[in-house]
UniProtKB/Swiss-Prot annotation:
Catalysed conversion reaction: L-seryl-[protein] + ATP = O-phospho-L-seryl-[protein] + ADP + H(+); L-threonyl-[protein] + ATP = O-phospho-L-threonyl-[protein] + ADP + H(+)
InterPro entries: Kinase-like_dom_sf, Prot_kinase_dom, Protein_kinase_ATP_BS, Ser/Thr_kinase_AS
Residues the record lists as binding ATP: I47, G48, S49, G50, G51, Y52, S53, S54, I55, K69
Key words, A-Z: ATP-binding, Kinase, Nucleotide-binding, Phosphoprotein, Serine/threonine-protein kinase, Transferase
Modification type Phosphoserine: residues: S169, S201
Record organism: Arabidopsis thaliana
Modified residues (Phosphotyrosine): Y220
Protein name: Probable receptor-like protein kinase At4g10390
Entry keyword annotation includes Kinase: yes
GO MF annotation terms: ATP binding; protein serine kinase activity; protein serine/threonine kinase activity
Boundaries of every Protein kinase domain copy: 41-336
């Protein structure tokens, strides 16, 4: 029987005073917009933006850098802010972005103060023309850290969480290129899957769809079922980006990476076919060819991607299964000291 997933609302207590107050978790609640303006020096430095929010450089505790995410003011988007706030207040994991503070006027305005990650996001790092190329050992470590973050929200939170928008631009990198999953505004909280009510019109269903071009699970687009399998599909696309260095979706060329990779993915899923080293190297990011990397590690990454983006949901592994596979089959990770996360 299909289970309906309802976004669970959590009570976030807030003491109203004229000064910022500290939650028991160490998260600071800012009680006036003046506090927010002070944190950002009156919003003097914009460092990022999305469809529904802008991100400003901020100073936390007077000196430490932080990132302030300000949501567009509207009642509907305030609900998105509340969802993300409620989730981040519950999450503590080394590979999930840390919430430092927040402002909530309980009506239409909201802001999240997040840890600052100096290396930006994974998409920017992979697509950058900089001479500083993200090395293979960093790429496999990012894959493991990301899937451990997904495993945490899928299996180790109560209630469980489906992120809903796993993509490389939602993977932030710290100074050591360790990754942090961010942006929980599209998350679903509760059971592992949901089915849209059968009485919902196609137009209404379309409005509720989440995801990003190149990353959205085709099964979700067809059925409206948001599940852990959807997150694993997005993870599989990110792995393809890590291996190939290509973007998930090129608006200029109208190409999706999953379509480019489809012939190779089909060969990998056909257990009777032994993929040649030449085919693997043709798909590999050419900036990595001079590295002395183990081609079997590349094959492992591609095999993981293939099962994660499979059209057969039964073939898609859990995050825990992928983490185990990477740890067992990619020797580079043992040298980096990567292991099972919290």
């Amino acid at each position: 029987m299909a289970c309906f997933l309802n976004c669970v609302r959590f009570d976030v207590s807030k003491t109203i005073t004229d000064k910022p107050t500290s939650q028991g978790s160490g998260v600071t609640c800012y009680n006036s917009w003046d506090d927010v303006e002070t944190l950002t020096s009156n919003f003097s430095r914009l460092i990022g933006s999305g469809g529904y929010s802008s991100i400003y450089m901020a100073r936390f505790s007077g000196s430490d850098k932080a990132a302030l995410k300000v949501h567009v003011s509207s009642h509907r988007l305030y609900q998105v802010f509340r969802l993300e706030l409620d989730i981040l207040l519950r999450l503590q994991h080394p590979n999930i972005v840390k919430l430092l503070g927040y402002f909530d006027d309980s009506e239409e305005n909201g802001a999240l103060l997040l840890e600052y990650l100096p290396q930006g996001n994974l998409q920017e790092k992979l697509q950058s023309n900089s001479k500083q190329v993200l090395q293979w050992r960093n790429r496999v470590a990012i894959a493991l850290q990301l899937v451990q973050a997904i495993e945490h929200i899928h299996e180790k939170c109560s209630p469980q969480i489906v992120h809903g928008d796993i993509k490389s631009s939602n993977v932030l990198l710290d100074k050591n290129f360790d990754c942090k999953l961010c942006d929980f505004g599209s998350a679903k909280v509760g059971f592992s899957s949901m089915v849209q009510p059968p009485t919902m019109s196609p137009r209404s269903r379309q409005v509720k769809m989440v995801g990003s071009p190149g990353y959205t699970d085709p099964h979700y687009l067809r059925t409206g079922i948001a599940s852990k399998k959807m997150d694993m599909y997005g993870f599989g696309v990110v792995v393809l980006e890590l291996v190939s260095g290509k973007e998930a979706f090129s608006a200029e060329r109208g190409e999706m990476l999953v379509h480019i990779a489809a012939p190779l993915m089909n060969e990998i899923l056909d257990s009777s076919v032994d993929i040649s080293e030449d085919k693997v190297r043709q798909f590999l990011d050419p900036r990595l060819l001079r590295d002395s990397l183990d081609i079997d590690e590349v094959k492992t990454m591609l095999s993981v991607a293939a099962v994660c983006i499979s059209s057969k949901l039964s073939l898609r592994p859990s995050a825990a299964q992928v983490a185990d596979t990477l740890i067992k089959e990619i020797p580079s990770l043992s040298f980096l000291g990567c292991g099972k996360g919290v």
